[in-house]
């Protein structure tokens, strides 16, 4: 009888050791995966940071380089006109600089088409929504949005908590 007890205790101990060993391996694998993920995320962030400054620097650099080259090569009288055209497009949204800078044919041409199209688009939207509202109000099943069950014949019985409990 003593030997059976001994073997049973040894079997249990071996099972415990095996479980501990497996748990330790799983923890090590998880830690390695977490470290790999962290490293991968850091690499991605670093690569994004490397790409973003280049993009940010590359976009402003060509206009700056063009301005410097245009300022270095031409005379000072040409520098002022080259600086003025970039300053002219931002004032265009305001009405006063448009009248002063441009004779008037170019800015009014883009503005009149949006004005007629905007009221027509608004009218279309209001007509469309009124049609949708009429269609919604004419639907027989949606009398009150707060109703628990619309008046429709769907073929399914209304699910209630008592029905659900009774099914089990």
Curated annotation (Swiss-Prot):
Residues 31-52 have a biased composition (Basic and acidic residues). Keywords: Coiled coil. Residues 124-138, 145-168 have a biased composition (Polar residues). Residues 23-168 are annotated as: Disordered. It comes from the Eukaryota. The keyword Kinase does not apply. Residues 70-82 have a biased composition (Low complexity). Residues 16-50 form a coiled coil. Residues 83-94, 104-117 have a biased composition (Pro residues). This is Coiled-coil domain-containing protein 200. The lineage of its organism: Eukaryota, Metazoa, Chordata, Craniata, Vertebrata. The gene is CCDC200.
């Amino acid at each position: 009888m003593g030997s059976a007890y001994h073997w049973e205790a040894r079997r249990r101990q071996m099972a415990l050791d095996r479980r501990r060993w497996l748990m330790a391996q799983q923890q090590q694998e998880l830690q390695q995966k977490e470290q790999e993920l962290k490293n991968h995320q850091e690499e991605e962030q670093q690569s994004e940071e490397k790409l973003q400054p280049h993009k940010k620097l590359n976009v402003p650099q060509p206009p700056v380089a063009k301005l410097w080259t245009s300022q270095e090569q031409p005379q000072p009288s040409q520098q002022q006109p080259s600086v003025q055209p970039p300053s002219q497009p931002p004032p265009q949204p305001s009405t006063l600089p448009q009248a002063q800078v441009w004779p008037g044919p170019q800015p009014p041409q883009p503005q009149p088409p949006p004005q007629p199209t905007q009221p027509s688009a608004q009218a279309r939207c209001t007509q469309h929504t009124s049609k949708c509202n009429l269609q919604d109000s004419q639907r027989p099943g949606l009398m009150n949005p707060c109703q628990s069950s619309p008046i429709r014949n769907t073929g399914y019985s209304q699910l209630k908590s008592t029905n659900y409990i009774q099914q089990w």
